Amino acid sequence: MFHDAHCVFSFYFSADGKAHRKSRFTQENNRYLEVIMQNIIGISSRRLRISALALLVPAVSWAADTASLAVGPQYDTTHVYVERGKMDAFVDSILKTFGGTSTERVLVNVTPTPSKTYSQLILTPAGSFSVFDFKTPIPHPFGAERNGFLVRDMDAAIRQARAAGADVQVAPFDDPIGRDAVIQWPGGVNMQLYWHTKAPNYKPLLSVPENRLYLSAYRVDDFLKSYQAFSHATVMSDEQVSDTTIGRSDNGKIRQIELDSRFGKTRIFVTDGHLPYPFGHERTGYGVDDLPATLAKATASGAQVLWRSTAAERRASALVRFPGGYIAEIHQTAK
């Protein structure tokens, strides 16, 4: 509010550096800066309004920002819903396979309707995992989302996603440490957007994981148009490859597309849906320096190799089932 000789003016900055009106976020534990102007003597109302407007300009420009709202691929996590009671075994196997650390396990409600789950975050050099072991039935549509993308501004991200053609399956809601929403891209690709009250600070990844998508020829172009508009992803390759890449052996070809953005990498397989098990069950591909050594660590810690590429493949890779039911692709990074 502005008055000629008396002004009380307040706003705060969230941890990502964005300015907000205090009235919108009075219950959040953000780092904030409150500016109070009271009993200002000798300053005209016109000058005071100009000064206040100058302070607000950054907030206006950020809100209008149409650039990518991504923070970085190390903040984008694969969502893993483990079989009930298998969280210990899963976390132990992932850490022994990839290295890294995990946060303290907590029992929380991470959905907008009543539910309870154990939740734990695993940070590895090859990618991050948000792990859930629900103690209650899982509310729909949770469990179908592939991953979570950290965004700098939730409201702006929702606007951008909708403008790009995404459906908002779960409108933004508060969780214990921020806000979340679930969106769906053309082709039925679900993902969660999240924003933290206190901005996290994770080390850069040694290898950025791939979001692996299987789409039909009827929907892939719609997905690309929509997802690229939101993520500002660049097409790194778009080519025909042998269908042995997806475990088939009929000497056919499939279209494979690779994207890269600040949200991370995406590898798209355009298929007729005739996929041998376990292809299509994996959501993420992880790059490692030494595939044989990594697979040895995985199997020693309770994982099972379900499929492995042949020597004729362009990229050495394997599909691995970890304790708790999670299936991942692991591949040798180029040297």
Each language-model region and where it sits:
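Bacterial N-terminal signal peptides that target proteins for export
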Residues: Q38-A52
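Bacterial N-terminal signal peptides
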Residues: S51-A59
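Boundary at the C-terminal end of the N-terminal hydrophobic targeting segment
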Residues: S61-T66
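Core segments of cupin and vicinal oxygen chelate
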Residues: L69-G72, H79-A126, A163, A171-W185, ...
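Vicinal oxygen chelate
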Residues: P73-G85, Q120-I122, F134-Q160, R179-Q184, ...
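A cross-kingdom feature marking solvent-exposed beta-strand/loop segments within repeated
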Residues: R105-Y118, S130-D155, R162-R179, K198-Y202, ...
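Short, structured interface segments
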Residues: A181-Y202
